[in-house]
């Protein structure tokens, strides 16, 4: 019998770029070992078109992706218990509430590509963000299944430096 998948929630500021990229990539590459979600503390109304374009270019399924607020995960009838919370922005890290089930928390900082002021800079930042997310998701998938929450925390912290 296969163990239940590790449920990972990626938290960012608006859930329109970084979190969406991480969620989609882990869903695409993680197989049955992982269940991925993303949310923002200050949810935006739509996914950044650059994020969707990068995912689509690589054949990553984007159906069902949309910006979500993190309160949807623990203040609603459909609340989901998560095993791991990965904050992707300083804002998400600072505002992250206490989570039901006491999940492992780790911070994987990534610059916000939506903060870029012109089109060329934005494209460059999106490409860099996408590459970092791909590399970190790949590193996560390559980890062997941890034997304890402490071991999981060490694995996740080591991935934070992957660029």
Model-derived segments and their meaning:
Residues 1-163:
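Short polar/charged helix/loop
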């Amino acid at each position: 019998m296969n163990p239940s998948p590790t449920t990972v929630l990626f938290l960012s500021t608006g859930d329109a770029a970084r979190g969406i990229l991480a969620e989609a990539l882990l869903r695409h590459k993680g197989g049955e070992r992982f269940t991925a979600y993303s949310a923002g503390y200050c949810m935006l109304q739509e996914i950044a078109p650059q994020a969707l374009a990068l995912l689509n270019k690589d054949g990553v399924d984007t159906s069902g992706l949309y910006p979500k607020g993190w309160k949807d995960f623990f203040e609603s009838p459909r609340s989901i218990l998560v095993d791991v919370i990965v904050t992707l922005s300083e804002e998400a890290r600072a505002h992250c509430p206490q989570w039901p089930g006491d999940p492992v928390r780790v911070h994987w900082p990534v610059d916000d590509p939506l903060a870029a002021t012109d089109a060329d800079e934005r494209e460059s930042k999106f490409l860099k963000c996408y590459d970092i997310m791909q590399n970190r998701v790949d590193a996560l998938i390559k980890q062997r299944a941890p034997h304890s929450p402490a071991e999981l925390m060490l694995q996740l912290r080591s991935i934070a430096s992957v660029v």
